[in-house]
């Protein structure tokens, strides 16, 4: 199906943001992106929306001492997010919904949202009540948010 055909049926597009950073000996370097992509993909399927390619290179300077981490500045991330969002809106999507997977992305995303007058929205994957219910049921007090089995 062509993008123009999908735009006839739906107005928005979903995009995941994550990070490329360490997650200890049990986690993958791309865990933040994998988690947000998984949830974004499920939402896109249920809502019959397109899923844009994910943004996995984001601010993670605090983890640069761990080999494998790739960090970009918050300003570079904001510029990238602005240009990607502008492109999607220019092509006819009415809004962009971000499913975020990295805490350091929150403030830059909020900063960029201001420029888009209610056409850019976000929710971090850990803010979905169903996700929290599953995490609490499966891991209880062992839930630690970062580099833990629930992630």
Residue ranges of predicted features:
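Active-site and ligand/interface coordination hotspots across diverse enzymes
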Residues: 1-27
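Short, charged beta->alpha transition segments
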Residues: 3, 39-40, 81-86
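Alpha-helix C-terminal capping segments
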Residues: 7, 43-44, 113-117
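Structural motif
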Residues: 11-13, 49-50, 96-97, 119-120
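Glycine-rich loop at the start of a catalytic domain that most often binds anionic cofactors/ligands
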Residues: 26-33, 65-68
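Short catalytic helix/loop segments, enriched in acidic residues and glycine
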Residues: 32-44
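Short glycine-enriched loops at secondary-structure junctions
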Residues: 49, 55-58
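Active-site histidine-anchored catalytic micro-motif
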Residues: 57-150
